[in-house]
A protein has these predicted regions:
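Conformational coupling and interaction surfaces
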Residues: 1, 20-21, 28-29, 170, ...
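Active-site histidine-anchored catalytic micro-motif
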Residues: 2-8, 12-50, 56, 86, ...
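Residues that cap or initiate secondary-structure elements
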Residues: 38, 69, 128, 140, ...
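Metal-dependent C-N hydrolase catalytic cores
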Residues: 45-55, 59-115, 291-301, 305, ...
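A residue-level signal for conserved active-site and pocket-lining positions in enzyme catalytic cores
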Residues: 63, 179, 251
């Protein structure tokens, strides 16, 4: 059983990643931390609670509220064009009776890591602010967590919030740089691979037809939320009838890394600069600079990834 902690800014793709983890028969979600990004920390928390209710995992999943802004305090607010006014495509899910715990997310991460040393995989689907704050509380955190899988960054592909930067890393470069040179066993799942894994209308039609009866409400939510995501991606990608699933791919590889191709390399994040702030700077020279290595996913089995993602919600075994 894979034990996961999830840190997210629950938007459309975050919600699908969370649903994937909660419905996976060989995953136990030990808790979810929320923060700013796709929406405010408060809205992300509300979305997360409603997603847990939708999933009906059959066990308690504590939710801890995290950072409301980056380490430097400057956050312009969410972009409703991408994820909708409420962060989940303006779909109104039933309200949950569950409340977030009082413990702030960074403290929750530290406590869980201390209680389960070497057992937990932390999956970050948004900015790394909560993890950076947790690291300030407990400098030994890299040795307490089994590993960290982060959706963020790009090495060879173009950026999505600037020519060279990806939104999660650029949203708090100082936090990301702190995490990258702290010594975590860190896997970066960025735009190099997430743009390769695209959900199409045909994939959604298959989900609609073959979803397991107990997952009907989940499938209906995904279909509705993805309509908004498709509309945005048609505007951003010149009417192409598909869209990437950034966060679900990171979650999928956290559960089963065998679908990816990886390379270890030293990496830091550019925290200054007029044009390159938020860029992941990797050293691919024969003799690299002296910096801790991270692992970067550079390729993925696209067909397998899509089939595995959808299989959790159908009657197929997700370990295809």
């Amino acid at each position: 059983m894979k034990k996961l902690l999830i840190d997210c800014d629950t938007g459309i793709d975050d919600s699908i990643a969370i649903l994937y983890a909660l419905k996976h028969p060989r995953v136990r979600v030990m808790g979810i931390c929320t923060g700013y990004g796709n929406s405010s920390a408060a809205q992300s928390t509300e979305n997360t609670l409603r997603i847990i209710k939708l999933a009906r995992p059959g066990y308690e999943v504590p939710v801890a509220v995290g950072a409301a802004a980056p380490l430097n305090g400057n956050w312009p607010g969410p972009n409703a064009i991408v994820h909708g006014a409420n962060g989940i495509g303006d779909i109104e899910l039933p309200e949950s009776t569950q409340k977030p715990i009082e413990e702030p997310a960074p403290e929750f991460i530290v406590r869980m890591a201390r209680e389960h040393p070497g057992e937990l995989t932390l999956v970050t689907l948004g900015r790394m602010t909560n993890l950076a704050l947790a690291l300030q509380i407990e400098p030994k955190l890299p040795r307490l967590l089994r590993n960290v899988v982060s959706m963020g960054g790009t090495v060879f592909a173009a950026g999505n919030c600037s020519p060279v930067a990806e939104a999660n890393i650029a949203g708090d470069p100082e936090a990301a740089d702190m995490v990258m040179h702290a010594g975590f066993d860190l896997l970066l799942v960025g735009l190099d691979v997430t743009h390769k894994v695209q959900l199409t209308a045909a994939h959604l039609a298959s989900l609609d037809r073959w979803c397991a009866p107990e997952n009907r409400a989940i499938a209906d939510y995904i279909l509705g939320a993805m309509k908004h995501y498709f509309r945005f991606n048609r505007l951003a990608d010149y009417d192409l009838d598909h869209c990437p699933v950034h966060d679900p791919l990171a979650m999928l590889l956290a559960v089963d890394p065998s679908a990816g191709v990886y390379r270890k390399m030293p990496a830091r994040v550019e925290c200054g600069g007029t044009y390159c702030r938020g860029m992941v700077v990797t050293d691919r020279r024969i003799v690299p600079f002296d910096s801790p290595y991270i692992t970067v996913c550079l390729d993925v089995d696209v067909t397998r990834a899509v089939e595995t993602l959808l299989a959790v919600f159908t009657e197929k075994d997700p370990a295809i």
